[in-house]
Amino acid sequence: MISIVLPIYNEEAGLASFVSELSLELTKTSENAEVIFVNDGSKDNSLTLIKKICEENKDFKYIDLSRNFGHQIAVSAGIDFAKGDKIMLIDSDGQDPPAVMHQMLAKMDEGYDVVYAQRIKRADESALKKLTAKFFYKFLNKITSIEIPVDTGDFRIINRKVANALKQMPEKQRYLRGQIAWLGFKQTAVSYERLGRNAGETGYTYRKMIRLALDAITSFSNWPLRLATLSGFFCAFIGFFLILYTLYARFILKQYEPGWPSLMITIIFLGGIQLLGIGMIGEYISRINDNVKNRPLYLVGETNIDPDASN
């Protein structure tokens, strides 16, 4: 059986058309299927629509989280409740066409543990977003010990072995595509063209993307801490030679003129480096603090899934 996890946040406008498209593609496969909606604190009527859809089809389930926990945690909740031996992660905004699932399932049948969808074309995305996304993936692959495929999102199919391994990763700052890459196992790609949204506006603002990028970097790399250390060594190196130059100018050249400019430049430069280092360390400490609290990753407000079905 394949479980299809759909994270939902304010998708009322385009959800019905996406579900129709998904249902059509499911009729073309021999796999038994369950569809799991994860309502991540939607402020529109998404939950009402989800409940109506679930009433009309016994294979459609829903999880209503107690508040908005974020896309990555919503997907994690869906994985936790999924019963299938294969789990497909896909957004419901229509940008990732459900028809690609047939190619992905064919690859799974070849023995792969993970099949991820790799974009060869992105519709309705600005040049800035495409450029920053490409730069980010290349940068992330440079500073981490794992390789996260470029031009991929969370659209993929994983098997039960991978899903169970993900459940053993308790960190609160989730970056699923990085976590799945870290797990290893046998992975491959299927190429596809990403479409424009079928309705509404994206919930992934630049602020949320920056937060996701920070989670990715701090979860898989110590590079920011090393940068702070190297900056400290660099400043100490420069400071040492400035001291030597000051002594040389004062006692050898007799050209030493006391003044505020050099002092202020030095203070501002060193202060900026110190604040940068403190900020980087603070990001890691904040994440340690979140994890040692040992709070649940999410809370379920209501669901039509049998509690015994989840792990």
Predicted regions and their residues:
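Structured catalytic core of nucleotide-sugar glycosyltransferases
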Residues: M1-S126
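Acceptor/aglycone-binding surface of glycosyltransferases and processive sugar-polymer synthases
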Residues: I63-R67, H71-F81, Q95-Q179, L195-L214
